Amino acid sequence: GTLTFERADTERFPCLRLAYEAAERGGNLPAIMNAANEVAVQAFLEEKIRFTQIADIIEKAMSSFCFVQNAGLEDYFDTDRQVREELQKQL
C-alpha cells in the first residue's frame, strides 16, 4: 500500500487551522486553545452546545483572552485556569 498525503482542508476542519495559528504564534496561545477546547468538548458531551460550536468557542477564546508572548510556567497555569473558569460560566 502506498500512502498519499494532501493539504489539510482547514475550511472543513477549522480546529486544525486554529491549532496551526496557536503553534505559529506561540506564547500562551496554545494553552488558551487547549483549555477552550477541553471545556467546549465537555459542553458538547453534556449536550449544552452543538458540535459545530466547538471551533467557534475556541476561536473566540483565542481572540479574547490575554496573549502573553514570553509566557512563563505561572502564565500557563493562570491562562488555563482563567479560560476554563470563564468559559464554564458562559456555557
Model-derived regions: residue spans:
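Catalytic, metal-anchored helix/loop core of enzyme active sites in primary metabolism
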Residues: G1-L91
